[in-house]
Amino acid sequence: MKVHFIAIGGSAMHNLALALHHKGYQVSGSDDEVFEPSKSRLAKHGLLPDEMGWNEANISEDIDAVILGMHARADNPELLKAQELGLKIYSYPEYIYEQTKDKTRVVIGGSHGKTTITAMILHVLNKCGVDADYMVGAQLAGFDTMVKLTESAPVVILEGDEYLSSPIDRRPKFHLYKPNIALISGIAWDHVNVFPTFDNYVEQFDMFVDLIEKNGKLIYCEDDAEVKKVAEDSDNDISLFPYSIPPHVIDNGVTYLLTDEGKIPLKVFGEHNLVNLNGARLVCASLGVSEKDFYNAIQDFKGASRRLELLGSSKKSAVFKDFAHSPSKVKATVEAVKKQFDDRQLVACLELHTFSSLNLKFLEEYRKSMKQADEAIVYFNPKTLKHKKLPPLTKKEVKKAFARKDLVVITDSKELKEYLLDLSWKNRNLLMMSSGSFDGLNLEKLAKKVTR
């Protein structure tokens, strides 16, 4: 099988390319830029393009499948050549489905918690010796790649993103997987550049539920009123399995589950993670994992990459970084750290980096999301607004949107670093939240200075 990737350098795309290479496929690809870690990983397996850029000469009649990434544009010369030759062109999710259509497909959907729930499921299945393929949105400890596709595994666990499939396929990715078992963790408006209204966004989840295979299962968080409505209003012939936060206690900085199997210590914390864990438990039960085996396996789960990651700690302070960027994720993450360390003050810092978060109309969704922080800081780079072709934001507008008069708004990375290092860190924790990089701020070095 000969497969060509247009935009092979993307996080998801290069992992799929590696998975197909390991499967014995003949893989080629192109991109206009490839960054680390994609660059080294592709080069290691001889898949890094010799030259950067697009070239229609890369497309020939003997290619069995062309996989088109979101980074490419609809007028991409390689895409146009493939269309001219009548080659089969797939979006990333379409090809994932093509590779997994004969397996039991488990799809984890929702506005938040998808990666963590998927990671929890894979961690448990791995420890319990259950053979499963997977596709997940972050690099996980104990797993070499973010995509695994084999002929032998009877089950595949897929993280189901609601963003668009490709430049020429405007369907949300998770509409293409046709799950046998689906999970919805929560619904909170996101991707406003694609779904301009909340109702339009919710509609995508209605359609997702309708696409669950006949006699399939929907596992859903009943604490979320919108999810509950989507699940219970569906006419699809499926079984419903609700979940919510499990009984637990926090003792001396450690969270314990209170279960029929006894008191289970965890390495993760935060109510949102406990809810995620309960959803993962129901998925694993659907795949034949006993409660006893689940609880034994989940005890040493340390969390998904970039989720409440501990960068440094001392007796007086700790520094965490988290991928949180949407309002619901920010609120849950701030509350988790504050509740886990209720004897310490919390300084929470959020970078506005995505199209949605920098959109003034959407910014009001962040109202009181950082209420539990003793000090709240919002950082954004005005150049990012220009790059995304959005109108300028003022500090006053940001403060008003967050409904917090004492909110500190900073627009220069060096100034942010200096501000944080000037604070006293006795009995104080720092939480840095972003899907970006705070414009290159070295958080590991910052953590060392804060906790020394």
Predicted regions mapped to residue ranges:
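Short pre-catalytic strand/loop immediately N-terminal to key active-site residues, enriched for Gly-Thr
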Residues: I264-F269, S317-K321
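Short, charged/polar "capping" segments at the starts of alpha-helices
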Residues: V34-K39, A57-N58, R73-N76, G142-F143, ...
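Fold-independent oxyanion-binding glycine-rich loops
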Residues: I8, S30-D31, G69-H71, Y92-P93, ...
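Phosphate-binding loop of NTP-binding sites
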Residues: A19-K23, A57-E61, M70, A74-Y220, ...
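Beta-strand->loop->alpha-helix junctions that form or flank phosphate-binding loops
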Residues: E51-W54, Y90-Y97, M135-A138, S234-N252, ...
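ATP-dependent carboxylate-amine ligase
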Residues: M1-E36, L42-D50, D62-V66, A82-L87, ...
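A generic structural signal for residues located within well-ordered alpha-helices
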Residues: T116, H272-N278, H325
